[in-house]
Swiss-Prot record:
Phosphoenolpyruvate binds at residues 22, 94, 122, 169, 345, 391. GO terms for biological process: amino acid biosynthetic process; aromatic amino acid family biosynthetic process; chorismate biosynthetic process. Keywords: Amino-acid biosynthesis, Aromatic amino acid biosynthesis, Cytoplasm, Transferase. The lineage of its organism: Bacteria, Bacillati, Bacillota, Bacilli, Lactobacillales. 3-phosphoshikimate binds at residues 22-23, 27, 167, 169, 314, 341. This is 3-phosphoshikimate 1-carboxyvinyltransferase. The gene is aroA.
Length: 431
């Protein structure tokens, strides 16, 4: 529990370097573990979720050395994993669970997979369904949740799968199984989801074709270890972008942020709301990077629809906070996915911001945010609950910057899932 005070009249100023991208850090570990030879990961995100992925591979016999934000992996190829001596603990990481269900679905030994209380309530059936069609043998609870077992399996077969809902995790699970499957695997997306898996597969020497929403690949003979320099996470940068926009007299630059076009929904949405964000591209061979500079500006309400969600799903809580300060209403629709995150993020965003006086209506697939609301703590301080959700915790901390009165935040340790040093970095730009 910590007490947070409003920003000073001076506002927020300076440069921020947020940690490495969580999605890319996960995938770099996975590809490094199944590739042949050494993989080096720099600007690695050593957060709780990603460290669970690392521990899983160590328990599968992969030699991994970590020195702060640098990692070396000695990969032994697809068949180089060894039976674990205990259940594979995914912690709170849905990314680890869903992607590894695909990647580990063709091993010659059984694996038990477990997670914490929150993860054990999140649905896994939508991943299991296409993997089962490919020949994977996965057992879950009657509710389609963890704990589960990935059974020993000698053969996978390629399938054509039409994604019913945009999901990078489901798509990636299919592709990670597909690189080990006989025949052709084809994933059809109506709305593009983040493409880090496809980009990284190519970097490690894999081959696939992606055209007009159709991703096609065949069994890969062997991947080769690589150097992966992880960009700063745009999902973490989003909190500082919004903080500068809504905190008076502020100007911040966030350094070396990954601006992958399947992840830059936050930039497009804030721009539509009236933000002017300076994007200074950085030459790079891997994922596109840029420095982002933003100043305090007046925002206006917009409609955020299903087509916007895949490239900004993790940023919707902080977008909701920005919308409370905008002129007019912001309507978020097609965001049912928020119901099955670490918390029901639709309900949790509304419950926490409403404690500060925000006027938000709940919809089955989103929310209606009535803008122009001053945030106020009754009786000089209000208690906000992180609810075990890292993105809710950081949203609450940014809300405290513009709240009249103090915020007492509980569960702030949840931030370590994606951004262990968030409060320290926020304090630096408040000086």
């Amino acid at each position: 529990m910590i007490r947070l005070t409003p920003a000073s009249a001076h506002g927020l100023h300076g440069h921020v370097t947020v940690p490495g991208d969580k999605s890319i850090s996960h995938r770099a570990l996975m590809f490094g573990a199944i590739a042949k030879g050494q993989t080096v990961i720099t600007n690695f995100l050593a957060s709780d979720d990603v460290l669970h992925t690392m521990t899983v591979f160590r328990n599968l016999g992969v030699a991994i050395q970590q020195n702060e934000n640098s990692v070396r992996i000695q990969g032994q190829g697809f068949d180089g994993l060894t039976p674990p001596k205990k259940p594979l603990d995914m912690g709170n990481s849905g990314t680890s669970t869903r992607l590894l269900m695909g990647l580990l679905s063709k091993q010659n030994f059984d694996m038990s997979i477990i997670g914490d209380e929150s993860l054990s309530q999140r649905p896994m059936t939508r991943v299991m369904k296409p993997l089962t069609e490919m020949g994977a043998k996965i057992d879950l609870t009657a509710n389609g949740t963890l704990p589960g077992i990935i059974q020993a399996n000698a053969t996978l077969r390629g399938i054509t799968y039409d994604m019913p809902v945009a999901s990078a995790q489901v798509k990636s699970a299919i592709l990670l199984a597909g690189i080990q499957a006989e025949g052709e695997t084809c994933v059809i997306e109506k709305i593009a989801s983040r493409d880090h898996t496809e980009r990284m597969l190519r970097q490690f020497g894999g081959q696939l074709e992606s055209k007009n929403g159709v991703i096609t690949l065949k069994k890969q003979q062997q991947l080769q270890g690589q150097h992966v320099d992880v960009p700063a996470d745009i999902s973490s940068a989003a909190f500082f972008l919004v903080a500068a926009l809504i905190t008076p007299n502020s100007e911040l630059t966030i350094n070396r942020v990954g601006i992958n076009p399947t992840r830059d929904g936050i930039l497009k949405i804030l721009t539509r709301m009236g933000a002017s964000i300076e994007v200074t591209p950085i030459d790079t061979q891997g994922e596109p990077l840029a420095d982002l500079t933003v100043r305090t500006q007046t925002l206006h309400g917009i409609d955020i629809t299903a087509a916007d969600i895949p490239s900004a799903v993790d940023e919707l809580p902080i977008i909701a906070l920005a919308a409370t300060q905008a002129d007019g209403d912001t309507i978020i629709s097609g965001a049912e996915e928020l119901r099955v995150k670490e918390t029901d993020r639709i309900a949790t965003v509304i419950s926490e911001l409403s404690k500060l006086g925000a006027n938000i209506e709940e919809k089955p697939d989103g929310m209606i945010i009535h803008g122009g609301q001053s945030l106020t703590a009754d009786n000089d301080a209000v208690l906000l609950d992180s609810c075990g959700d890292h993105r809710i915790a950081m949203m609450n901390a940014i809300a405290a910057l513009i709240t009249t009165g103090d915020v007492i935040l509980t569960g702030e340790d949840a931030m370590s899932v994606s951004y262990p040093g968030f409060l320290e970095d926020l304090s630096e730009v408040m000086l």
